[in-house]
Amino acid sequence: MSPLQPLVLALLVLACCSAVPRRRQPTVVVFPGEPRTNLTNRQLAEEYLYRYGYTPGAELSEDGQSLQRALLRFQRRLSLPETGELDSTTLNAMRAPRCGVPDVGRFQTFEGELKWHHHNITYWIQNYSEDLPRAVIDDAFARAFALWSAVTPLTFTRVYGPEADIVIQFGVREHGDGYPFDGKNGLLAHAFPPGKGIQGDAHFDDEELWSLGKGVVIPTYFGNAKGAACHFPFTFEGRSYSACTTDGRSDDMLWCSTTADYDADRQFGFCPSERLYTQDGNADGKPCVFPFTFQGRTYSACTSDGRSDGYRWCATTANYDQDKLYGFCPTRVDATVTGGNAAGELCVFPFTFLGKEYSACTREGRNDGHLWCATTSNFDKDKKWGFCPDQGYSLFLVAAHEFGHALGLDHTSVPEALMYPMYRFTEEHPLHRDDVQGIQHLYGPRPEPEPRPPTTTTTTTTEPQPTAPPTVCVTGPPTARPSEGPTTGPTGPPAAGPTGPPTAGPSAAPTESPDPAEDVCNVDIFDAIAEIRNRLHFFKAGKYWRLSEGGGRRVQGPFLVKSKWPALPRKLDSAFEDPLTKKIFFFSGRQVWVYTGASLLGPRRLDKLGLGPEVAQVTGALPRPEGKVLLFSGQSFWRFDVKTQKVDPQSVTPVDQMFPGVPISTHDIFQYQEKAYFCQDHFYWRVSSQNEVNQVDYVGYVTFDLLKCPED
């Protein structure tokens, strides 16, 4: 990718070179924040041919013969007209969205035939894209595996840990495997051939819009469509809509048709919207109230003011300052832009561009045909923009292709086959005879007469959501989601929207069963100690104890870690809870897990946080104000940003420089009641801060002083 261009609006003026009048050329705009490339067609071809294995180097000789040979090889491989020239057909093929696996050669080179030598293949969905509901992603992957199990003896079982044969991951740009993605469009995904470690894994570019190939997938609530997804585009009163709308309503409730023609079918539902419900917070899912007052100011829309993590929230009464009731606003997938310089923001309609007003996404100003919108009311003034949601790429089809690689298949030269390198949307059965012959060459045909779906295990998960209020913690998050709302509605967009929230929420956490026979005072050295929900937790070998609230017994437990956090390993190195978002980070070896309630992100490698291979483990964490955390390893610490989930690489600091007097080597570092604790063996050094100076104010025993164990 070329460097970002200066934020300058430049119009390309085409000079008239003839007295004959010409049709006015479209205005082409250099959009601020958009990566641009000045590659010539030859440079594009050389880069492409090298990347996908057709040439040994990125630059070819000037005589043109080596380029011609490479082009012929490329054209022959992909069943294109064999001209040996950089013609329009060849250039269009090079610009088409495709798989990132090389056509010639492999990511990893091994001798012999690469295939799995067992038939029950396991897979793990390590993380999720926010483009689709998790249940839709789970289903897309299960259906993709089912294509291959229907024609082979293979079965596919979902597991929940890195021991899986195939680890599925969404990532952006450089995502830890040495084969970076390239942003929106272009390279969609890649996978590695069978084997240990990263071999067999499948990675998907999360800068793409993932859908089922026919636009964003938006579930509906209430209405009369029984939760069916929106159908885009749809027709209402003779007009076509490609996003949820408030037209036809007087209450500003967003709705959509769930068929192509609302006028004919009258099937509709309400779209996720802050006027329908809020998420988490402390208002039991009640909808936003607009306008509302916060710190004396009036707000007529969701805002991130008062927060350092960028989450959009609203008050659920007219006065937050008085009532302190709030919730987080649902994401508008149908109107959230990607790319540009305002990714994640909402389109604002109408907006002004070059003096003209636009009430929908437009292609004006672009020569690539992509729809875009401004995210403020005036692009000419603010220069804030992004790409509008398009049809997206079918996660099911791309996954089925990548899983073919994960099973040992190469690209084919048959354009109609699933394993052809270029993306092609189809609603027909995607497996071609060529695909079936290839996979059965490796594993043989399915012995059963009737194909069956793969063996899978599914769980219901929820999107991670922050739970802290705009400024200070008012109350904890609700223990249960709001009760079910109405399930039926009028046949047309009603005059008033339902008052209830979505009809489903996360399931309750497993009941903990303490075993009093196991005494915390018998534990020698704990694996990790952390303050979670304002209570000190002690972790050891898959179990944990916690200090009780108020009076009564001082220590509760032990509890099984997996009863509360099922994905965690038996051995933990450290943990911390971010006081702002209530996210809980758990570290073990070179991996980190992030829990928000029952929702999980990870495990992720420490590389994702910006911690290099020299960091073998994170031995402690000290939360700091405004979403910052100090992460410790060995004799150093780094400053970590919870919002970006990245460390500042320039922040590495010796521990004794900021915390003089603590041991050189510590195994548990945690914060409790606003003081830092550094543990070594059975002892801890407590550090307090006065006038921005840290000093040890107490040295004590973990068992006797923190746990109040008897000294005899």
Curated annotation (Swiss-Prot):
Q: Which residues are glycosylated?
A: 38, 120, 127
Annotated residues for binding of Zn(2+) 1:
175, 177, 190, 203
Task: Please list the residues that make up the propeptide.
Answer: 20-106
What UniProt keywords are attached to this protein's entry?
A: Calcium, Collagen degradation, Disulfide bond, Extracellular matrix, Glycoprotein, Hydrolase, Metal-binding, Metalloprotease, Protease, Repeat, Secreted, Signal, Zinc, Zymogen
One GO cellular component this record assigns the protein to is: extracellular matrix
Localization (cell): Secreted, Extracellular space, Extracellular matrix
The identity of this protein, by name, is Matrix metalloproteinase-9
| E.C. designation(s) | 3.4.24.35
